[in-house]
């Protein structure tokens, strides 16, 4: 990782929000397609929370792997692109993977897609999102996951995290 000065260029909120996209990619790869859908997100300063669908409680080892994989992707300096597309074109090109459980209103006809490209050029994460994002994962800093909360009755996994420095 680089010195802490590099991270001060971008607001904590932007770094933390961008981290959500990196963590989501890791969650899908570690926990599988059952955790594809985001139910909610939260960011405040250097703290964030990602809530995803999850059919079964993950093991401690799986949570550790999500953190490890997320930080690996940060160190790989993955490129992040925001692309504006018509909703129809975005849905035709990428399907419903661009959406979360909370719907985009039907009157929205143009979407901003945030694409995190993996080191091999494939898509690590893609999502319709109108927030500000970093140009690269290297500016995020280190992700430290906190104790997750599995809500069995709703089949949801809440993953709180902090971004350091």
PLM regions: where:
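Active-/binding-site microenvironments in catalytic and ligand-binding cores
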Residues: 1-165
């Amino acid at each position: 990782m680089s010195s802490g000065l590099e991270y001060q260029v971008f607001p904590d909120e932007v770094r933390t929000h961008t981290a959500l996209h990196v963590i989501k990619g890791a969650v899908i790869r570690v926990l599988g397609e059952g955790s594809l859908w985001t139910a909610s997100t939260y960011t405040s300063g250097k703290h964030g929370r990602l809530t995803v669908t999850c059919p079964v409680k993950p093991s401690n080892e799986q949570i550790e792997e999500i953190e490890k994989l997320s930080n690996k992707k940060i160190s790989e300096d993955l490129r992040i692109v925001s692309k504006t597309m018509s909703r129809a074109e975005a849905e035709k090109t990428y399907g419903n993977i661009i959406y979360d459980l909370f719907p985009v209103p039907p009157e929205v006809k143009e979407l901003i897609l945030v694409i995190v490209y993996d080191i091999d050029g494939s898509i690590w994460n893609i999502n319709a999102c109108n927030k500000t994002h970093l140009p690269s994962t290297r500016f995020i800093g280190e992700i430290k996951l906190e104790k997750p909360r599995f809500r069995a009755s709703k089949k949801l996994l809440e993953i709180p995290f902090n971004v350091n420095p």
